[in-house]
Regions:
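Radical SAM/AdoMet-radical enzyme domain recognition
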Residues: 12-35, 44-169
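Canonical Radical SAM [4Fe-4S] cluster-binding loop centered on the CxxxCxxC motif
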Residues: 1-12
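Cysteine-centered iron-sulfur cluster-binding motifs in ferredoxin-type domains/subunits
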Residues: 40-43, 233, 286, 292-294
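Radical SAM enzyme [4Fe-4S]-AdoMet core and its adjacent flexible, acidic
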Residues: 101-121, 125, 129-236, 240, ...
Length: 338
């Protein structure tokens, strides 16, 4: 795909080398994860299958264990592909933004004609049925165009999906669909509306999981993971079709954030270290925040796009995170009282 650069496909040679890089870079760690992301990975399906096969071979030789996830826009899904995903992928992320008019406004066909919603919904419903009790979720994005995103969550649940994530858009501030401070009051009220919907559906036997409301109060990640969140730049890297390494997919194509290649390994170790050191205890704004061990300092890319630095938290994101946590705590308190 053309995510962050020109439209191109990753070669099998590059994909295999990415597996080799992961084996070497993970050192003593046994468990490794590979996420097929795009662009659209189904456009390069043979390479996806061959990469899985190659990693399985290397498991036997190295003692590593690979876990695979794939994120797809669904247009290229067939029964054969669904069966392969269900047999080989730990998780599958099905991209859809909710109601037909919302989805089709942002997710268009290459020709610009027809409805992507009409193409993907029957396929997603079949995938949900075939998936059984294996992990999956439908994943949407809300923008300035659909601040009433609780209605999109309700719609996705009405379609039969019970594992749902709808995320705020991450984009440059100048985009017409970007979120801004003027949208905040509506967004916060909408999360409260969503919490009420969550409880009402659960009480009626139509419950669903919403990603941001799944907060583990008693167990959860260790302190190390809570400090730095996603691990972008040092535990998690994105590989471009050409084999270049970036801290995450949001930085792909930005040369100043290139940290190496799958052939040469990590070259810009200083940048990688900067991401590692950019945790909640090193950010002045975060130190006194009650939510710091749940949000882990927010999204580095969002911070960069809006606050000007990946080390400076974006206040709009902070406010949304706190509201999501408040809603999650409210839901858990209601569950405890019931």
């Amino acid at each position: 795909g053309h995510f962050g650069g020109r439209r191109e496909l990753m070669s099998l040679e590059t994909a295999r080398q990415a597996v080799e890089f992961l084996i070497a870079a993970s050192k003593h760690r046994r468990h490794c994860e590979i996420d097929f992301f795009g662009g659209e990975p189904l456009l390069n399906w043979e390479v996806v299958k061959e990469t899985v096969a190659y990693a399985r071979e290397r498991e036997k030789e190295t003692g590593k264990e690979f876990r695979f996830t794939i994120t797809t826009n669904g247009i290229g899904l067939t029964r054969e592909i669904m069966d392969f995903i269900n047999d080989n992928m730990y998780n599958v992320v099905l991209s859809i933004d909710g109601r037909k008019e919302v989805n089709d406004r942002m997710r268009r066909t290459v020709s610009g004609k027809g409805s992507t919603y009409d193409l993907i919904v029957p396929k997603y419903q079949e995938m949900r049925r075939l998936r059984g009790d294996k992990s999956y979720y439908v994943r949407g994005t809300f923008t300035a165009y659909n601040l009433d995103f609780a209605a999109d969550v309700a719609h996705l649940n009405d379609l039969g999906f019970d594992q749902i994530s709808v995320e705020p858009v991450v984009t440059q501030a100048g985009e017409p669909y970007a979120l801004s401070e003027e949208h905040l009051s509506k967004i916060l009220a909408e999360y409260e509306q969503l919490a009420q919907l969550y409880l009402e559906r659960r009480e009626r036997g139509r419950g669903f999981n919403f990603f941001h409301f799944n907060v583990e109060l008693k167990k959860g990640p260790c302190l190390y993971k809570r400090l730095s969140g996603c691990g972008a730049g040092f535990e998690y890297l994105a590989v471009s079709p050409a084999g270049d390494l970036y801290p995450c997919h949001q930085f792909v194509g930005q040369d100043e954030f290139k940290v190496g290649t799958v052939w040469d390994g990590l070259i810009n170790s200083q940048l990688s270290a900067s991401f590692k050191e950019s945790h909640v205890l090193s950010k002045q704004v975060c130190r006194g925040c009650w939510a710091k061990y749940y949000c882990s300092g927010g999204c580095h890319a969002n911070n960069l796009f809006h606050a000007g630095s990946f080390t400076e938290p974006y206040q709009l994101t902070c406010a949304m995170e706190k509201k999501r946590l408040e809603c999650a705590f409210f839901i858990q308190a209601r569950a405890a009282s019931d």
